[in-house]
C-alpha cells in the first residue's frame, strides 16, 4: 500500500515537471470569450428610472449645515450654555458690585477629623506639663522572663532528665 501511494506521488511529480514540453512562451495571451449583451430593439427606448441616492443617516452626517442666505433672516434659537455642575465648578465666583452690599454667609472651615488632628508643637517658653503614658506591658503570651544577672544567685529549678521510654 505504501509503495502504491509512493508510485502515485512520483508519477504526479514527473508529469508536473516534464509534462509541459512546450518551452516557447505563448505569443499572445489567451482571451476569454464572453457572450455579448443582446442588442436593444428599436422600440425599446423607454427611459430607465434611476432612484436618487439616499441621504446619509443624521447621526452619520458629517458635512456642515448649509449657510443661511442673506435674504433669509429667520431668527434661530440658540440655547444658553449650561452652567457646570456645582461639584465640578472651578472658576471663582463673580465679584460683587459695590452697590450690591448684601451680606454673604461664609461658613467656618471644618475642623480636621479627630483621628487626623495633630497637636500644635509646644513652644519653648510654654512649659505646660505633658502627659506621657507608661509603655504598655508585653502580652502575657509574649512575655519573657528577664535573664538572671551573674551577681544574683537566685536558685533556678532545673528538672531532672526524663528516663528513656520503656519500649525504646
Curated annotation (Swiss-Prot):
Task: List compositional bias (Pro residues) regions by residue number.
Answer: 158-168
* Chain residues in the propeptide: 20-42, 63-70, 91-98, 119-124, 145-150
One GO term under biological process is: defense response to bacterium
Residue ranges of region Disordered? 20-168
Top-level taxon of origin: Eukaryota
| InterPro entries referenced in this protein's UniProt entry, alphabetically | Apidaecin (IPR004828)
- Location in or out of the cell: Secreted
Q: Which UniProt keywords apply?
A: Antibiotic, Antimicrobial, Cleavage on pair of basic residues, Immunity, Innate immunity, Repeat, Secreted, Signal
Q: One Pfam family, short name please?
A: Apidaecin
Output the Gene Ontology cellular-component terms.
extracellular region
Q: Which family does it belong to?
A: Belongs to the apidaecin family.
Q: What does this protein do?
A: Apidaecins have bactericidal activity; predominantly against Gram-negative bacteria. They seem to interfere with cell propagation.
* Protein name, UniProt field: Apidaecins type 14
Q: What species was this sequence derived from?
A: Apis mellifera
Starting at the broadest rank, the lineage of the source organism is: Eukaryota, Metazoa, Ecdysozoa, Arthropoda, Hexapoda
Q: Which gene encodes it?
A: APID14
